[in-house]
Amino acid sequence: MNQWVSVDLFAGAGGASTGLRCAGLEHAVCVEWDEDAAKSLKAAGFPAVHGDVRDLSHYEDIERVDLLWASPPCQAFSTAGERKGALDERNGWPWTLDIIDHLQSRGIGPRYVMCENVPGLTYHKADCTGDVEQCPGCYWEGWIIPEFKKRFDWVGHMMLDAADYGVPQHRRRIFLVAGEGPVKWPSPTHGPPNIALQGTMFGSPVKPWKTIRDALGMEKFIGGGRNPTPRENDKRTYRDITNEPSTTVAAVTIGNAGPFVAQPGSEPWRLDKPSPAVTCRDDKGARHQKFDPSKTPMTAADATWRAAGVRRLTWRECAKLQAFPDDYPFEGRTKKSLYRQVGNAVCPPIAEILGRMIIDALEQ
């Protein structure tokens, strides 16, 4: 049996690394700039390097790379920010390609590359003029994809929602794969309860979405008004509106972002659905409103879990919505750091599924 070797760039606290390890890949190195996140990586047993991914000395002892995973900083492209795109100083795509060139020049791979980023990377600006330096969508179509096609025989990409693969959170991300040949993208394993039922009856079965209640066990927050326990004639209403995953966990630490959980006596949120986009901020704001799950959540302030009477989810609760193991050894000197690490992470189950997909391609 082959031992497949991976390199993790912009590794954060280890979400992708954890998933890839579960899939059966062995890490040669995991590089992360943030000191606390690098400590978390090391505590979790990964070969962590605290440093700049552009420092090529980090890769000198590597003899083979089967998969290079990269999660370049998303702030340059997120719809929650200014979307400076290619000109943003945090744009890590050129750095990723430089590392690929370095490894290929030594003849050690990578055989496949997996890159993860926010959907906003693929969206065109309203005032788009076709300039790849000014419009993220043009940068994606006119520079990123062509640059990978120069280096690999096959390039593909797909948007995935973590909730469709067993994570109790709606977290949409674009995944780019480049390598020796096509991959077979994973089919969803979970879906809305009605789709799950139809699938069982008429096609490939999927399980119902995992929910906030599944992850956090918050039965006591179903109550409404001043009474934390709904009246008998309210039970159907509250049951019917409580079926949803969380929204995306993000990593900003200012403003009035959630996620929040209703305090006893407050109006309930949809606990029996996947969480909305959970923003990992230390909440200091005063504006709280109910999140409208019918709207597409953004990564920052709009992508929150809010209610009339609220408390901020703890960073450990956020980690549960990211589907980290309960005992994952996050290291951090401040709550701000811990929230940021959790919110920046790739959901481990998604990385595991995609890691298995890459292994299947490697074994062809």
Tell what function each PLM region has.
Residues 56-67, 74-283, 292-302:
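Class I S-adenosyl-L-methionine
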Residues 46-52:
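Conserved SAM-binding strand-loop segment of SAM-dependent methyltransferases
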Residues 351:
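Acidic-aromatic/histidine active-site loop/patch
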Residues 41:
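Conserved SAM-binding loop
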Residues 31-34, 116-117:
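Conserved acidic E/D residue at the C-terminus of a beta-strand in Rossmann-like folds
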Residues 9-13:
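Class I SAM-dependent methyltransferase "Motif I" SAM/SAH-binding loop
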Residues 27-28:
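Short beta-strand element of Class I
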